[in-house]
Amino acid sequence: MQIAKNNEYRTTTDQKPVLNYVADEVELETDKNADTVIIPYSDYNTVKYIYDEETKEYTRYSRGEKQVDWDTDTTVTTKNIIITFAQNYNLNDGSGKGRQGLDNIGKLEGYYITNGKAIEITCEKTSRTAQTVYKDLQGNEIKVNDGKTFIQICPINAKVTIEGENKTTEE
């Protein structure tokens, strides 16, 4: 904060936060367990998340190996995963780099995943410059657990897998 003050940077904004983070722990009311999440982007690039019940975070894997932060050399983890499905297409920009465009204006479908559970959501964006709003299927803006969040935008036909064990407790 001191660096911001020294450089006369703004420390407040009139913009609404992108996600509705809440301090109280969000426990999704659903039977859909999400211990493993697999997102195939192509034949050679699949992202996988595995839930750790002790830390209540997901470890991220890319191309079959734990993803490691280059700067800190620590394993990449996240508290929340938001998956949205959007129509994608090749940009013919002459670069030859395989860049993709996304049709993300309107209402999209997806999932919110946290604490080993998943719910279906919608994502609404009214214009290119508008903020995306994430809602549950009842139309309420979702409450997101405090912590890191990965937003995964997937091709509309991606075969995302969300798996979980139906755990039972014995007394």
Residue ranges of each PLM-predicted region?
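A surface/extracellular/periplasmic glyco- and lipid-processing/surface-interacting theme
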Residues: 1-171
